[in-house]
Amino acid sequence: MGTVNKPVVGVLMGFGIITGTLRITNPVRASVLRYDDFHIDEDKLDTNSVYEPYYHSDHAESSWVNRGESSRKAYDHNSPYIWPRNDYDGFLENAHEHHGVYNQGRGIDSGERLMQPTQMSAQEDLGDDTGIHVIPTLNGDDRHKIVNVDQRQYGDVFKGDLNPKPQGQRLIEVSVEENHPFTLRAPIQRIYGVRYTETWSFLPSLTCTGDAAPAIQHICLKHTTCFQDVVVDVDCAENTKEDQLAEISYRFQGKKEADQPWIVVNTSTLFDELELDPPEIEPGVLKVLRTEKQYLGVYIWNMRGSDGTSTYATFLVTWKGDEKTRNPTPAVTPQPRGAEFHMWNYHSHVFSVGDTFSLAMHLQYKIHEAPFDLLLEWLYVPIDPTCQPMRLYSTCLYHPNAPQCLSHMNSGCTFTSPHLAQRVASTVYQNCEHADNYTAYCLGISHMEPSFGLILHDGGTTLKFVDTPESLSGLYVFVVYFNGHVEAVAYTVVSTVDHFVNAIEERGFPPTAGQPPATTKPKEITPVNPGTSPLLRYAAWTGGLAAVVLLCLVIFLICTAKRMRVKAYRVDKSPYNQSMYYAGLPVDDFEDSESTDTEEEFGNAIGGSHGGSSYTVYIDKTR
């Protein structure tokens, strides 16, 4: 869907988890069967058909399939639409996945032009009796195409093209009157012998009024990606949810379609709860016999074929005469300015002396302002085989007069300001009015430095090397200036195998003469007194180590003697506000005669003698 000035959400093209009672309807036999909790009583169904659950892995859709005669082939594991029965329990877990938001990528990336919204009243449908139906065209205007019903049953209604291919979105606005019927007809394309699965979902707009009501607006996701789509306000989305109305599966057999009936699975209880009749579903058709306000909203139709084809359509159903919905206010999108440039190139090119080759910069652009000035410039610095790597400070291309770029360290291994580089070639387009294709319609003036002996091609984006000598090895930098400002930078190292060096692009300014490079850490060197003898240094180290060992030994002996004189155990003299006392592990012999009083006190405290057995005592003073 799209965006407006305040936060909005798009109508989701997927389907949520299926709940409720299934109502399976065979329109041809006019029989209605009800089953709860997805359990099918096959004894009550047609004995010539087998109904099996299956899951669309690409679109997280679930359904029941009337396999018919194909049931004799058991399960078709090669089909992307039929899953083995043991996977049936898993499809509900993934049923919450969606196609996406805002219909992004549908009919845009494929290069097809999106259809503009059309006003199609329910009265424009001439009815089944006449054999004539109104089909919206895909040529970007508001005209309609009238085709015969029999023609719609065979292949593509648009010039009879039977080649399967993805279709762009069909965006159709339908105006209806209260208590009148209306029919939604999808611009369907079918191929003989292909099994199709169609799904209908519905986003009601009953709770969405005023500015929150769904409306068709002009959406721009990017400067170059704009289209018409249905926009749903975020306040509306919080009060409503999308329902999957039904799913229909059938194999298209032309005029024999009536001999192989389709099966419709109604998976929504929305209209049952409102005590309204659910819409009638046929291949590519949704019918409502008596329109009430509960039927207004967004309907999404999706069709997939077993041959891999897919198409879908979005219908916005509103009251007839609703001027707000009929003539929606386009969303305010900022006018793009400036230009966008993107380049693809190799960062290195290895050659042999005498080779002829081309160095190309593949430039893609979108220019939003005209007239404009464009400068394409090639710069060069020689490479030093001892430099590993060469460093390109691209910041200096944007600030060529900065002091750090004009005076820096290691100038032979860096590329900084263009003022310090050699100009190889340049192409200028001045006061150009043609933003779509400036190379074809604008005058470009090129200049080549004769000392290099190179040839400029492709409007200034390609350098051709002929009988290349080794002296042309170097770092070549390509810069795009738009109206005097740097817009894009690219580089390539051209060298022989023997003198190849790598090049990297650095962010920020290069280090100055008094500043070490940020990427290297200077080594700390401890000065040594040249008058000190190695023998004296060795003696000093040995003496110091011996002193440390002796000190540690003395401390160890003192601690050991002290521990031999301490009490065998002691009671922690904790204050009485604590809840526990902790006693240690007693031993058999007590060498300290001064510990008798404490031991007796401890024995009396616990109500017995301590003896000589080992134990740990926890005394709770609260007892």
Curated annotation (Swiss-Prot):
Identify the stretch annotated as signal peptide in this record: 1-30
Task: Give residue spans on the Intravirion membrane side.
Answer: 560-623
Function of the molecule: Envelope glycoprotein that binds to the potential host cell entry receptor IDE. In epithelial cells, the heterodimer gE/gI is required for the cell-to-cell spread of the virus, by sorting nascent virions to cell junctions. Once the virus reaches the cell junctions, virus particles can spread to adjacent cells extremely rapidly through interactions with cellular receptors that accumulate at these junctions. Implicated in basolateral spread in polarized cells. In neuronal cells, gE/gI is essential for the anterograde spread of the infection throughout the host nervous system.
> What Gene3D superfamilies does the database record attribute to this sequence?
Immunoglobulins (2.60.40.10)
Similarity section: Belongs to the alphaherpesvirinae glycoprotein E family.
**Molecular function GO terms recorded:** enzyme binding
Q: Which residues carry this modification: Phosphothreonine?
A: T596, T598
Renumbered to this chain, region (Acidic) spans 588-601
Residue span of region Interaction with gI: 208-236
Work out whether the entry's keyword set contains Transmembrane helix: yes
What keywords is this UniProt entry annotated with? Disulfide bond, Glycoprotein, Host cell junction, Host cell membrane, Host endosome, Host Golgi apparatus, Host membrane, Host-virus interaction, Membrane, Phosphoprotein, Signal, Sulfation, Transmembrane, Transmembrane helix, Viral attachment to host cell, Viral attachment to host entry receptor, Viral envelope protein, Viral immunoevasion, Virion, Virus entry into host cell
Q: Which intervals lie on the Virion surface side per UniProt?
A: 31-538
- Description of how the protein assembles with itself and partners: Interacts (via N-terminus) with host receptor IDE (via N-terminus). Interacts with gI; this interaction enhances the Fc receptor function of gE. The heterodimer gE/gI interacts with the Fc part of host IgG.
Q: Write down a Pfam family by its short name.
A: Herpes_gE_N
Phosphoprotein among keywords: yes
Which intervals of the chain are annotated as region Fc-binding? 352-499
Record motif Internalization motif, residues: 582-585
Major localisation: virion
Descriptive protein name: Envelope glycoprotein E
Q: Which processes are annotated in GO (biological process)?
A: entry receptor-mediated virion attachment to host cell; symbiont entry into host cell
Q: Which residues cross the membrane?
A: 539-559
Checking InterPro entries in the record gives: Herpes_gE_N (IPR046463), Herpes_glycopE_Fc (IPR003404), Ig-like_dom_sf (IPR036179), Ig-like_fold (IPR013783)
Q: Which residues carry this modification: Phosphoserine?
A: S593, S595
